[in-house]
Every structure is written in structure tokens, then in C-alpha cells.
């Protein structure tokens, strides 16, 4: 694969702890991951970029020359989780089911989970 692997994006180390990649669409496309920002569980995303293009090799976002993640606000994270569930249900092999379940358990309020 000719792009920066999302599991190698660990900056900023003082704030971010990666738990797992939920969805990786590959080169020149997006990835979604689950982790903790300042100890709080969150869903994040980034554009992977391409190592074949020096201008885009680190993807986006980048902070201080290091590839990073964008933390999704709760309302966007919930909609993203629903879409990832649909993709998994339709057989999309790029969805990491185990990490998706960890993410749902950590981010879905109990009242929402009982109404699903």
C-alpha cells in the first residue's frame, strides 16, 4: 500500500491514544479510528493521503509536520457509527467489526443502545 497507514498516526502523544482502526478506505481516501483524547473515548477521522505525491504523503490533518486525527463531535460520531454499522451489515470488509463494537460500547449512551 502506498499511503501512510492510519495505525501509525499517533500524534500528539500527550493527548491521543489509538485503540484501533475502525475503517480504512485506503490510499487517497479516509480512515476512521477509535481511541482516547485526554482519557475520553472518541471517534476520529483523517484523510490518508498518498506516498506517491510528496505534497499529500502525510494526509490530513497535520500538526507541526506530524499526521494527526480530527476528533468528531458527538452528533457526527453517532451518525458515523450508524453508517459504519450499515456498511458492515452489507458486507464491507474494510470495517473492523471488533473495533466497531468496542467503539459503540464506549460511545453510545445506554438509553440509545436500548432503543436500537
Predicted regions and their residues:
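Negatively charged, low-complexity tracts enriched in Asp/Glu with abundant Ser/Thr
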Residues: 1-26
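Short linear sequence elements within intrinsically disordered, low-complexity coil regions
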Residues: 8, 21, 28, 39, ...
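A short, structured beta-strand/loop element
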Residues: 28-63
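Mixed-charge, Lys/Arg-enriched low-complexity segments
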Residues: 49-116
